[in-house]
A protein has these predicted regions:
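Exposed, interaction-prone assembly regions rather than primary DNA-binding/catalytic cores
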Residues: 91-165
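Acidic, low-complexity cytosolic segments
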Residues: 84-88
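Basic helix-turn-helix/winged-helix DNA-binding cores
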Residues: 1-71, 76-83
């Protein structure tokens, strides 16, 4: 039987644990310091479904969780590459895939890899495909998958470690 690192560590452990780390990552305590992202831009992103509005009474875009800030940085980066908001929304859905199973997190996959990067300092990458779908994973798994799949599509490569600094 082949060992599946992701299945054991994410699906088998992280997703089902109530970790204090998840609570900290998802606690709204940080201000957004990206001058290009105004409240108007945030409202537009909310209207297109790229971000979820979790504001109390729908007022004030002043506080975000660490995970939300990482997601906003990723949106900015993907927009710099010319990806449309509709395609970014597809990527959001990929990252939110396991949110129904995790009461603590909107983006369990991001939280998992944030914990992994902080704990082990190994390289984690994002691959964003032309249709907006994305993969996130350790460099070793993504490299192995690319070598296995001879018909691999082109993608945008984003260094997750650099994104979260």
């Amino acid at each position: 039987m082949q060992y599946d690192w992701f299945q054991v560590n994410f699906l088998g452990c992280f997703l089902n644990l109530n970790l204090e780390f998840k609570t900290k990552l998802n606690h709204k305590q940080y201000s957004l310091s990206e001058p290009s992202v105004t409240p108007r831009v945030l409202h537009h992103w909310h209207q297109t479904g790229v971000i979820t509005d979790r504001r109390a009474k729908g007022k004030g875009w002043s506080k975000f969780s660490f995970t939300e800030l990482v997601w906003i940085k990723l949106i900015i980066r993907l927009r710099e590459f010319g990806l449309s908001l509709d395609k970014i929304k597809i990527g959001k859905e990929d990252l939110s895939k396991y949110a129904a199973e995790d009461a603590e997190s909107t983006f369990p996959l991001l939280d998992f890899y944030l914990l992994y990067v902080r704990s082990f300092k190994h390289l984690v990458n994002l691959r964003v495909f032309e249709d907006g779908h994305l993969l996130i994973g350790r460099e070793t798994e993504l490299f192995a998958q690319n070598n296995y799949d001879q018909k691999a599509k082109d993608f945008i490569h984003i260094n997750f470690n650099a994104l979260v600094k």
